[in-house]
Design a protein with these regions (language model features):
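Active-site beta-loop-alpha junctions enriched in small/polar residues
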Residues: 6-10, 33-37, 68-71, 112-114, ...
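Glycine-rich, aromatic-flanked loop segments that form ligand/cofactor-binding clefts
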Residues: 56-64
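Active-site acidic/histidine proton-transfer and metal-coordination neighborhood
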Residues: 17, 58, 75-175
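Catalytic domains of carbohydrate-active enzymes, especially glycoside hydrolases
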Residues: 16-35, 103
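Structural motif corresponding to alpha-helix initiation and N-cap regions
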Residues: 12-16, 45-50, 163
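Hydrophobic residues within beta-strands of alpha/beta enzymes
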Residues: 30-31, 64-66, 107, 147
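Glycine-rich, proline-tolerant flexible connector loops at the mouths of alpha/beta enzymes
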Residues: 33-57, 111-117, 121
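Extreme N-terminal starter segment of soluble prokaryotic enzymes
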Residues: 1-4
């Protein structure tokens, strides 16, 4: 078993100290909430990405991937309207590229507020998400990054609220 820890527990101050502590405590990797590293992660420069990758690699840890993908972006919504949906998908596609640049292999899609149905029909949203998540999975395949759907309870969101629904989504996309 490999153990990784999120940077959410530490924040962004004294990041090297955090990496050192993780290694000393027997962790193998780190998961990052990208907006805790950069104000706007997808606008990070090649140099900033290389610096972070080197920093993690030099610590002896593996960069596993990203979670809390849309934490700092309440404007990005899958089901609010078509314009927001397109911007959300584009943003996630850019996060796949960023994750790959850092050597990561997974994006964990929780983002409960960003996947709210906003009163829209569940079946319509489900169909649209199949197409959108397939597009994301295709980009992930090109970059060797997995897009993982995190089922969240109904007290957090109203879309993909059980392991069963998450499993059905994965089977439907079949990627």
């Amino acid at each position: 078993m490999k153990l990784s820890v999120s940077n959410i527990v530490w924040g962004n101050e004294k990041f090297d100290d955090f990496l050192k502590l993780l290694k000393e405590e027997g962790c193998d990797g780190i998961e990052l909430a990208p907006s805790l590293i950069w104000n706007e992660p997808i606008n990070s420069s090649r140099e900033e990405r290389q610096k972070l990758k080197k920093q993690i690699n030099n610590s002896g840890l593996e960069f596993v991937g990203f979670h809390s993908l849309l934490f700092s972006r309440p404007d990005l919504q899958l089901f609010k309207d078509d314009n927001s949906r397109k911007k959300t998908i584009e943003y996630i596609l850019n996060l796949i590229n960023l994750c790959a640049d850092l050597g990561g292999k997974q994006l964990i899609f929780g983002s409960p507020n960003n996947r709210s149905l906003h009163g829209r029909d569940y079946e319509q949203c489900l169909k649209q998400s199949h197409d959108d998540f397939f597009e994301i999975a295709e980009q992930g395949l090109k970059k060797n990054v997995f897009f993982c759907i995190e089922p969240l309870g109904k007290n957090y969101t109203d879309f993909i609220i059980s392991m069963e629904e998450g499993g059905q989504m994965v089977k439907k996309i079949n990627h």
